[in-house]
């Protein structure tokens, strides 16, 4: 089984980034969206109407710097409750802004929350993947996508995803220098790559090999049914 899940991060960060994510959903280029529920621009209605699967994009940066220990657990609980208030349900999956959810001092409260609500968690490397699976948490087999703007917007693994569930992390958006994001230009590049890929797919070019597109929830449901 080869499955590709395309996840757009940072919904709620900035209005023009929200627009880019919604545009990517409309063109059929995104399956899942990670929402930043503590941000003032996390408006639920357009995302709910889009039909995309919605997860929680956890933030552990407080006013005075990174949170850990009891403050981190409190921050996660508050964000989980806020997600429920906004979207009327639990998140379908969990991941973290700048992969904060994978930091050793923060991984445990994230795993405990995932266990509580029955949600998969994004794994950022093989060690993190093994750690989650040892605790019974579903996680994709591979994460692709760039963390820095100098990396290629179209990952080479996309042409031939390996067996299992591959998650492609993207940050589509329309540029806006007022956002304050150091990744501003790269968001426009990500959106352009998604547009290009969907155009190629429209003409039956095998842009992701023989992988099947899916949401995370559906991918793990099928995996369970087949095992």
Question: Whereabouts are the PLM-identified features?
Answer:
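Terminal accessory/targeting
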Residues: 1-6, 15-59, 64-93, 105-227
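His/Cys-centered metal/cofactor-coordination and adjacent catalytic loops
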Residues: 10
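Active-site histidine-anchored catalytic micro-motif
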Residues: 95-98
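Active-site pocket-lining segments that scaffold enzyme catalytic pockets across diverse folds
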Residues: 101-103
